[in-house]
Amino acid sequence: MKVGQVIAVVDIGSTKVCCCIASVDEHEHFDILGVGYCVCFGVKHGIIIDMDLVSKSIARAVEEAEKAANLRIKSVYVNASGKFVRSELIHSSINIGGRIVRHEDVKKLIYKSIKKNPKEEIIHSIPILFEMDSMVCTTDPIGMFSNVLNANVNVVTIPKVQINNIIVSLARCHLDVLGVVYSGYAAGLCVLNEDSNQENQIVIDFGGGVTTINFFYKGRFCGLETIPFGADNITRDIACGIRVSNLNAERLKTLHGAAFVSFDDKKNMILVPMQEENNVINLQQMPKSDLNEIIQPRVEEILKLIKEKIDKSVFKCDFANNFIITGGGSMLTGIREFVSETLKKSVKVQKMEDFSENFGIQIENDFATAIGMIKFALLSDDINLNHKDDSEKNDDIGFLKKTMSWLENNL
């Protein structure tokens, strides 16, 4: 990308919509120009269920980011998440004939791995490991001699109806879609550094409505698992258990909540805004233990499901020790220790960097997906089928282009 080129992304989550606008610097990195944030309604477990509400949330977040950046945006990268996102490792093979492997060979191999499905849209196709003549394994075969080139390709798909709803929601805000990025992949791109290219790691993204388990083989996204519970479930448990509004439940969780009950919690008193008759708010004291006794069972449930998913995964043996947690739920006090105890592994909470000192804000962990999408747009070596040359598109793979054309003519 050219220096000064603008990248805009929209992260549509179950609890918030985030818009980030960035520009490319001379070092092929980026500076954040503006951030917009809005509470999101109309999304459940990462899936849009009310397009009108979602579009309004997107519009507010984009407007806020545009004001901060002092510019208007027309096109964005957007995320996709939810339990219907699928990841499949597909083996593919082509004959090279003893010559040097070229970039075109790798593309041909990846395209060969794609299975046509009229109901699914491919959003990522990522080569994980190449094998040459059944002997040499490498992550980059280009420039090497081979007779036969094999590859395991991670193909990530999403139902076309789901991606269509995302595109229409953005089109209602007069925004075109440049590309769709799986949320867990983006979160991993955000928190993994260059050293990660030598390691196998699991990135657990604690979102609002969905928790995802994302497997990275030497920096390459190779698999995913999804749990339809997240930090918002904890908030609703608090609201129900203490009988406060969701807004006050979120504040209590943020200010006083912890993943487990500690010894001193019964001694520590907190103020709880209880709503009485006639909508009068009355502050009442409550032991901190009462709050955390509500939080702990839900955290235990989510972590139990995470452990079950990992234990059943084909990647279990290869990803034994390296765990990173991120997302809004990772900011809950004590979550690292609780995850480590449950999984019996060393766990790291990856703190986000302040990506733009000039912007004057600290980017928190719940912005990991948005920052990862900027990295995807800037640096990704993933072959995104939504950006292929027209000569290489077929009817299935060109779904996004056809959808956008339909929207332009009908909205």
Model-predicted segments: where are they?
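Nucleotide/phosphate-binding catalytic cleft detector across ATP-hydrolyzing
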Residues: 1-14, 20-203, 220-222, 231, ...
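Short beta-strand scaffold segments in enzyme catalytic cores
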Residues: 17-22, 211-215
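Acidic-glycine-rich active-site phosphate/pyrophosphate-binding loop
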Residues: 31-32, 206-210, 214, 340-354
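Core structural elements
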Residues: 80-83, 208, 327-328
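Glycine-rich phosphate-binding loop of actin/hexokinase-like ATP-binding domains
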Residues: 199-241
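Feature representing long, continuous alpha-helical segments
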Residues: 236, 289, 293, 297-304, ...
